[in-house]
Regions:
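An amphipathic, basic-hydrophobic helix/alpha-beta surface used to engage anionic
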Residues: 47-293
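Short, structured coil/loop segments at alpha-helix boundaries
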Residues: 13, 31, 35, 103-104, ...
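Extracellular/lumenal glycan-associated context and N-glycosylation machinery
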Residues: 1-66
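Intrinsic disorder/low-complexity segments enriched in polar/charged and small flexible residues
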Residues: 6, 19, 127, 141, ...
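Short, exposed beta-strand "edge-strand" segments with a Pro/Gly-rich flavor and a Y/T-containing core
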Residues: 4-11, 223, 291-293, 359
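Acidic, glycine-rich A-domain
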Residues: 259, 273-378
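Acidic, low-complexity intrinsically disordered regions
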Residues: 13, 33, 121, 135, ...
């Protein structure tokens, strides 16, 4: 009842109930004794109560809330939330309480008390909200509340201020990753009659030498030629693996344990950005998006991804790195693929059948994910 009154009219505060009781008592005493001064006291009390009912809602009428866009962050960092409250009324507003109605998965509503906003002025409120997990979070409203000027009645009103906050998954700082580095070694071994594998797409073969440009990887500098010419020369690479790109695919249409799936998303983000740092052509596949490329697009897709997605796209038939919890899917991987397998906690260890045709990693949730992604594949 109190909530209904506060959001649609006004609800008495503790002081309001006390004054209301006193006014009724004086009015009753005046009826019994016919004393004029009792009527005066009760009349003044009722007048104050009437003002206390009218003024709080009126003080909120001229307030407009605008919200600034929220910059994306990585899980574990703080969201920076900024709101501006404009006072368009002809008189100042005082003793205001502002509450940002966050979604419950992000945190509890955040409150701020504002002493005064002058006529035609604005108040900027900036706060930082911690994040723990990735996701795309949306919320719509900001709640304004006041009991000014008398504090006898309290009212609250909602203002529309829709916003979206994007929290990217964590990216592990991988220093090496055999899943990426050794991708394509089997194919290049079969294609070389001398038994020496060709370079992978991350390395290639030297086509020609050119002057060094700022931003070129140091590993591409040809030191002998640079010493001969007296300037840095860089190898231009001819990619040998037929232009293959590495596709990191998450089995998002399958059933997952929630914690395993969150680890898989972190692994996908870490593998993607490791390959990107190695200047390898890389893409991400999910059941809902299909194949996507580009840092921002991939980050947003991984922020929004969920398991048991209703996707119509099938995994590509080219070699890929398959992240899954279902070992039965490993038997249908394309040639040259790799896999990363999480075990369902409800499945006993001896019941898990792993496909040994392709190398991969079986994740132990008790160990560091970063360490396991950096170890040699089997």
């Amino acid at each position: 009842m109190t909530n209904w009154l506060e959001t649609r009219a006004c609800a008495p505060a503790y002081g309001g109930w006390i004054l209301m009781g006193i006014a009724i008592c004086f009015f009753g005493a005046g009826i019994n004794t016919m004393a004029g001064w009792l009527y005066v006291i009760s009349g003044v009390s009722f007048a104050l109560l009437g003002l206390a009912v009218i003024l709080p809602p009126r003080s909120l009428l001229g307030l407009v809330v605008k919200r600034l866009p929220i910059e994306p962050v990585t899980a574990g960092d703080d969201l920076t939330v900024e709101l501006e409250i404009f006072n368009q009324a002809r008189q100042p507003t005082s003793l205001l309480q502002v509450q940002d109605m966050l979604p419950f998965v992000l945190g509890k509503p955040i409150q701020k008390s504002i002493e005064r906003i002058s006529h035609g002025k604005s108040y900027r409120w900036v706060y930082h909200q911690p994040t723990e997990r990735r996701g795309i979070f949306r919320w719509q409203t900001v709640e304004l509340g006041t009991g000014a000027p008398l504090g006898l009645f309290w009212c609250r009103r909602l203002r529309d201020a829709a916003v979206m906050a994007v929290v990217y998954p964590k990216v592990l700082p991988l220093t090496t990753c055999p899943l990426i580095d050794e991708m394509g070694d089997e194919d290049s071994q079969r294609g070389d009659p001398r038994g020496r594998p060709l370079q992978t797409a991350t390395q290639g073969l030297t086509r020609c030498l050119r002057p060094y440009h700022i931003g070129d990887p140091i590993r591409l500098i040809h030191w002998r030629t640079s010493a001969r010419y007296g300037e840095l020369r860089v190898r231009e690479l001819e990619v040998i693996t037929g232009g293959q790109e590495i596709i990191i695919a998450i089995d998002s249409a399958g059933n997952w344990n929630e914690e395993n799936f969150e680890q898989a998303v972190i692994a996908a983000a870490s593998l993607y950005f490791y390959a990107h740092r190695q200047q390898t052509q890389v893409a991400l596949w999910t059941a809902s998006t299909g194949i996507i490329r580009g840092k921002r697009v991939v980050q947003e897709a991984l922020a929004a991804i969920a398991f048991q997605e209703d996707g119509t796209t099938k995994p590509p038939h080219s070699p890929l790195i398959w992240l899954t919890q279902n070992p039965l899917t490993l038997s249908s991987l394309p040639n040259g693929s790799r896999w990363v397998l999480w075990q369902d906690v409800s499945t006993e260890q001896e019941q898990v059948i792993v496909n040994k045709d392709y190398p991969g990693i079986q994740i132990d949730t008790e160990q560091s994910l970063q360490t396991q992604l950096q170890k040699c594949i089997r």
